[in-house]
Amino acid sequence: IGLCLVGSEMCIRDSRTTGEIFETPQVAYMMIAATLFSKYPAKKRMAYVKAYYDAISTFKISLPTPVMAGVRTPQRQFSSCVLIETDDSLDSINATSSAVVKYVSQKAGIGIGAGNIRAIGSAIRSGDATHTGVIPFYKLFQSAVKSCSQGGVRGGAATLYYPIWHLEVEDLLVLKNNKGTEDNRVRHMDYGVQFNKLMYERLITGGNITLFSPKDVPGLYDSFFADQDTFKELYEKAERMTSIRKKTIPAIELFSNFVQERKDTGRIYLMNVDHANTHGAFIEEVAPIRQSNLCCEINLPTKPLSHCLLYTSDAADELCR
């Protein structure tokens, strides 16, 4: 079974028409080693190639899909997972969608940090329009993820992260279940729900969790990751303010909904953002952890993409920053 899996998904083949496989797994291992060390000095190169081949062909080193399936092809990309964060603007959302398509096409799994998008009904341009909510944009990201087949190796996949206190969280928790319609479900991504100590304290003490739109409480979303004391101060102050749109829900009810959806649908991850920052390799005040990857297994600092600039000149293609 393993041989068939490697041969059908990782070996070079004619994926468009006949499906003919052009190499065996051992040839693939040799080509990977030869490609990776092709720029090394000629006197040392073969020794490195052989040592690396011996390590990967005997499974002492496990290779991620982009390396295993694509590093010996013209489209070389070494990142197995890419973390992409969006801000609360159309330019940033479009830049994120563009980046998702680019990296999915290069066989990467995607982690999307999308918790900062304002909630449905929020004012846009000082009330010139009202926000449609996060679900239409999650659908956009889902379409971007599923737009490429990754060369027939595997379908695109992504996990999208948002905080448990987001104003739309009750609708977000059910995005994967089989109830509802296509209009209010986004089933083909996975989700990571983000918690911190304050949320657990509300649960343990039988308290409530107050839901906000991130846009309505400046600094709340950033401090959720970078400074727990500041987050608690802003959160409790916002709870007392009558001018801020909010919704209060018993913590036990919200946690129960999360657990039920996680049990029923699978792959709804729990991310403790305070522990991710205090127990990691990065300084939270300088480079806070704001999301994880496709499998919710790594912590790397991110910053939101600002916008994509598209050029029509022959000298420039696309710039995301």
Residue ranges and their predicted role:
Residues 79-309:
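Active-site cavity-forming subdomains of large catalytic enzyme subunits
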Residues 1-7, 12, 311-321:
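Single conserved hydrophobic/aromatic residue that forms the stacking wall/gate
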Residues 8-9, 13-78, 84, 232, ...:
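Acidic/polar, glycine-rich intrinsically disordered N-terminal extensions of enzymes
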Residues 14, 38, 58, 62, ...:
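Conserved helix-loop functional segments at active or binding sites
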Residues 12-15, 186, 289, 320:
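Short, intrinsically disordered low-complexity segments
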